[in-house]
Regions:
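Bacterial N-terminal signal peptides that target proteins for export
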Residues: 1-10
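Hydrophobic h-region of N-terminal signal peptides that target proteins for export
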Residues: 12-21
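Patatin-like phospholipase
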Residues: 21-61, 69-295
Length: 296
């Protein structure tokens, strides 16, 4: 593990010299999906910045779209670190009203609807379209993207950005290059069966992880010459490891996009493969987030 980190640092430190010597090719950072594991992207962005590498594009899926979208409008890795640690994830991953905004009686009633962690179905009110409508997350994204709440061309952001979702109506990949930033980020991480799809222009948009969880091809199509990828995707499980609904559901998602994932890995110049052993998409505890950011 330590040897791999030294090799990575050497590669990143040498990269700026290569870029400048060759006439400054365009560099893209690609951030994979992975739920809570995606908080490791913040640590990786810190390392890339410390190495002095210029970033011309940022592209992401699911949690990679959240981190990437906020980074593209000027949030620093340090600010993202503070923001992630300041959140009440139990509240955000639910449709419960803000405890500060309700009376005690209503607050007690709402407790039955609070989701402890994603994929845990205890005491969760299941809607027709998904477990969580995502109102609290949508509200947070809207607040964090203040100043970018109108429809915008993502190529005109401080760092050009794109993210990936899937249209559940026909299974097609949807790449956001423009629109309302908060809506695009929310659409990219709308896990089917957990979050209700986002209705937009006749589409039912869900998490892009099943069609393109590591969207290197999107970055290349935008004009990137050099790809730095940050991958927090867990490896495929063996038969003996498929022991829970969470394991099975995660395996299905990973298998859907496995072919494209392998192709995108081959087109990556520098890969930061984060060690996510012991953590899942649902590891939103403070201790887990702190560890994942350090591993990134």
């Amino acid at each position: 593990m330590m040897e791999m980190k030294y090799r990575l640092w050497a590669c990143l430190l040498f990269l700026p010299m290569v870029l400048w010597a060759s006439g400054r090719p365009k560099v893209a950072v690609v951030l994979s999906g992975g739920g809570a594991k995606g908080t490791a992207h913040i640590g990786a962005l810190k390392v890339i910045e410390e190495a002095g590498i210029p970033i011309d594009y940022v592209v992401g899926t699911s949690m990679g779209a959240i981190v990437g979208g906020l980074y593209s409008i000027g949030y620093t890795p340090q600010q993202l670190d503070s923001m992630v640690n300041a959140q009440n994830w139990k509240f955000l991953l639910s449709d419960a009203p803000n405890p500060k905004d309700v009376l005690l009686d209503d607050r007690l009633k709402s407790e039955r609807y609070v989701l402890s962690i994603p994929f845990s179905l205890k005491s969760v009110a299941v809607s027709d379209a998904g477990i969580i409508k995502g109102k609290n997350l949508a509200r947070l994204f809207s607040t964090l993207t203040e100043g970018y709440q109108d429809s915008v061309d993502f190529s005109r952001l401080p760092i050009p950005f794109a993210c990936v979702s899937e249209n559940l109506v026909n299974g097609s990949e949807v790449v956001f290059h423009e629109g309302i930033l908060a809506t695009s980020m929310r659409s990219s991480m709308s896990i089917p069966g957990v979050f209700a799809p986002v209705d937009l222009d006749g589409m039912g948009l869900v998490d892009g992880g099943m069609v393109n969880n590591y969207p290197v091809d999107v970055a290349l199509a935008m004009g990137a010459d050099y790809i730095i990828g940050v991958d927090v995707q867990s490896p495929l499980l063996k038969a003996s490891e498929l022991k829970s609904v969470k394991d099975i559901f995660g395996q299905i998602i990973n298998l859907q996009g496995e072919k494209k994932y392998r192709e995108n890995l081959r087109n990556t110049d520098v890969l930061i493969k984060v060690d996510v052993t012991g953590y899942s998409a649902a590891s939103f505890t403070k201790e887990a987030i702190d560890t994942l950011m350090v591993r990134g």
